[in-house]
Amino acid sequence: MYKSFYFYLFLVFSINISAEPMDHMDHMDHMKNHSAKMHGPIGLMGDHFHRKGESMISIRYMKMYMNHNYLGTNKLMDLNILELPNPTGMPKNLSVVPQDMDMDMVMLGGMYAPSDYITLMGMIMLEQKSMDLRSYKPMMSRDIVGDFSTNSSGLSSISMSLLFKILNREGSRLHAQLGLENSSGKNNLKDNVLTPMGTINEVILPYGMQLADKSYTLLSALTYSKTYDIWKFGSQIKSRINVKNDQWNFGDSYETNFWVQRDLNQITAWSLR
């Protein structure tokens, strides 16, 4: 079972710093390459590279609200879930049902280019998770026992990557990313739950509510973008492959993204991904 994504909110703040003096032509080129659309949509990481001596710091905020339970592609009501067997033993059937979940993520990032061909990128991820659940009696009428919430917050992960410029001419930019992420937050957080018997117990939260899995993940990506005046089109393929884990891990992932952006002014752009 999993939750369907219902609402997203993205905010980003970044500062670009050039460490080298520039003449007039360099300054014009610098301004052209640092319009708002040169930064991809907030959900993309490592979407651009920098010139030698440039650096950037950024703060990204993302909020996700999720509701509804699914088994595969089939939406389940609470009564459907109460009929499913309990994989942990007693009671015989599932009796605690998630209702909705909020996730708040803050990403603190930094980039620095020691050369025109390599950009260093670091990221610290902080997360806060909150889930509302409902407990039902374990037998007979399966009446509602009550509602409760569980929460977790703190450091999630730290990552370091290298971005390698492959192409940068006539509005076309192509680069590769290779990095390593350490899921260094806590993976055994506990909280109080309302049991089907009506008691309050402190238990280890399920993996979806944990902040980290104590694993190391190899990050790799290939990103291409093309700029036409005030328009920009881009695509990115990305993989996250676990290379070392503790007792469990979140699993590997593979992503493909396509986006289009348009400048509104020097500091603002809209995007569709």
Place the predicted regions along the sequence by residue:
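Sec-dependent signal peptide recognition
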Residues: 2-10
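N-terminal signal peptide c-region/cleavage motif recognized by signal peptidases
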Residues: 14-16
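Transmembrane beta-barrel domains of Gram-negative outer membranes and organellar outer membranes
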Residues: 20-173, 179-182, 202-212, 216-220, ...
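Outer-membrane beta-barrel translocator domains and adjoining extracellular loop/strand segments
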Residues: 69-76, 132-140, 187-195, 236-237, ...
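Aromatic-anchored, glycine/proline-accented short structural segments
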Residues: 213-272
